[in-house]
């Protein structure tokens, strides 16, 4: 796993950009009143398809993702957040994707009892963003972005939340991403948790002309079963629909780069701490 790509523009940008995880690394249960110096999860799994912001690249791109999510509470309002993810492609992807490495670093801010904001800096190497940076814009396979995530738990529907995120990519590819979703996390039994999420993803000035706008709709259901202690197994299933912007991206690329109406399934082994 090579993180050397971090030490180029990041050193110059880190002063002015601090940021959050576009996929909401905001905790599933943010109401815990205790301050914790270290909490998070270590995860390894398998997915039938690789996903990038709701988009499914053409071909059967199976992946073996490995990730670490870390949070350190600084005080009752602020927490430091870190996320590392390596998306490994066991076989040769249909569109020649490189393994994807993602690093997120930032801060989370508690806004009252049931609302949170997170602001972070993300470095991404490889994957669909890296391919697009090289093939569509003639740059390196590394991109950098700043991101803001806002989440609000709904008092009138216990376990439900709404969430929105915006991300600006400022290196490799420049442009905006917006992700709006709603979902629920609930405990069914002592050892079984269930969650679902439904959302829409849009882009602005990220892809070449004609490829922006509504990118995808997605729906995902996840079960989390405690095997023992703090070790869980998490199967999931999701459905992705391709939007008008995604179809425009295929026309710009000149061939089918992303597909819609695709199921994604997988399973992960998770250690929570």
Question: What residue ranges belong to the model's regions?
Answer:
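Outer-membrane beta-barrel "beta-signal"
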Residues: 226, 232, 259-273
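Residues on the lipid-exposed face of transmembrane beta-strands in outer-membrane beta-barrel proteins
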Residues: 44-48, 66-72, 84, 105-109, ...
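Glycine/small-residue-rich hydrophobic helix-like segments
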Residues: 204-256
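Sec-dependent N-terminal signal peptides of Gram-negative exported proteins
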Residues: 1-22
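A contiguous pocket-lining binding segment that forms or flanks enzyme active sites
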Residues: 167-205
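Outer-membrane pore/translocation modules
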Residues: 57, 80, 84-181, 238, ...
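Short glycine/proline- and aromatic-enriched beta-strand/turn motifs that initiate or cap beta-hairpins
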Residues: 17-92, 270-272
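Short loop/turn motifs that connect adjacent beta-strands in outer-membrane beta-barrel proteins
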Residues: 26-39, 73-81, 93-95, 110-118, ...
